[in-house]
Amino acid sequence: MRITTSKSKNSESFYITQSYTNANGKSTSKTIRKLGTLAELSAQLNTDRDGVVEWANEQARLETLKYKSEKEDATVMIPFHSNRLMDYNKQKLFSGGYLFLQSIYYGLKLDSVCRKIKSRHKFEYDLNAILSDLIYTRVLEPSSKSSSFRAAKQFLEPPTYELHDVYRALSVLASEMDFIQSEVYKNSFFLGDRMDRILYYDCTNYYFEIEQEDGDKKYGKSKEHRPNPIIQMGLFTDGDGIPLAFSLFPGNQNEQKSLKPLETKILQQFGCDKFIYCSDAGLASEDNRVLNHMGQRAFIVTQSIKKLPAEDRAWALKKTGFKRLSDDKPVDLTKLTDDDKNQLYYKDEPFTTKKLDQRLIITYSPKYAAYQKAIRAEQICRAEKMVANGSLKKHRKNPNDPARFVNKVAVTNEGEKAKIHYYLDTDKIAEEEMYDGLYAVCTDLLDDNVADILKVSEGRWQIEDCFRTMKTDFEARPVYLNREDRIKAHFLTCFLALLHFRLLNRSLKGTYTTEQLLHTLKDIKFTDIEEQGFMPVYERQEITDDLHETCRFRTDYQFITKRKIKGIQKKSKRR
């Protein structure tokens, strides 16, 4: 509310007016109350014009408070007509799940990052709006860039840019990929501490439905066993499974070599130089261990027992020398009772290679041994059927294929064609049984508690879950992109989407699964009620209550006025 005046030849009148947006989206105003003329009010209040203006402004303030109170508490009456058709081309349903991701986006100060990037480039489009929408749609409606643009039009805050701006922005984002990663890492501390004393590293790859190699898209060993060119990704996460940094490298490159460039970037640009590196055996080469034995770094990596030197392998397979992890009590694995089946047992010894003094820890889990034995029993049954049928695959790519237990011998009489005889390879079965329940870890933490070391190693599932989320839920494979810069920007978007999602889930204290949170965010929608406001059309649950409490705004009122919606949008961008 505000004061307006109307002057004539002989008098000046004072009014309280209110500004509002009409049905056509234009700003206009209306008179709420006439206060009187200057002469009347001066006589009534016994003051001059300045005193009248001061009094009038106070009346406008009180009228504003009264209006707000009535709007907050009033029952909204909106007429509907059963004989009136809907208007053409009028959007009625809006998506609102992005609001919760938006609170993370602005918490990471990505709007400030975009302003810094703009100062180094010449473009007119709104990079902040484009990047934020790319992230939100990757979580809520993963698809091509054009489809994502259409999906963003369903948001309560639709795009003000055009599709061609999106493709132009991809080139800029690709050129600033390293800068964006380092900035969001530093800014993530505004949203809580990072467990960056433990860093997990792993690699995956993404295939392209093309027939020839192109740029970094090279033929390599696909995780999906596809015969297509691939691009590989290396990913670091912190100890909580929250993404830290990523890199892309050609599909035909040995993934062991991908670690050093990315780790160097973390050391130099992130200011993160004291951590324990943890990976599986595939990324635990001698050089990678040496790299993480320097400075204030250390490593905990899994070790293939089969690839140990003969003497160490023989020691690992012996059933003697084990202790119970819970109390360090020596045990004989051949005399375990049923009560001992749920325990974990270990033994350790110095393990010296050409370049490093390490510690080799062997663990034994009766429960895991029983599981492996049960799986193998099923595979042996299938192998026996293959022998009985005399049929065997020529090419066996899967190391867990039951056909690995089938061997063959050529039987022939002199001058006759050889006859192939298949048989069950019991020696192969016996060899595998020796490794049941066993697991090996190598570390340069020579004096640390074994239980603590194993706990860190067990956390590797989190980075595997990150890849699963990106590939399955965020549909990260860039089917519709060919240019190298746009592919980089696409994976940057996927990385940032994963970071937003993980940080949001962490703010909920990890109470909900990935599927539960994704389903909830996608379901949060609103319908426009005759341009008077919005009505939520989703189911209120504990998870929605927790989201509102965490992000400090609520969208679950029975009816939300347009003014309130704008307030919610503003709160979602509050740092």
List the model feature ranges, each with a label.
Residues 3-5, 11-13, 24-27, 108-575:
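Anion-binding and metal-coordination hotspots
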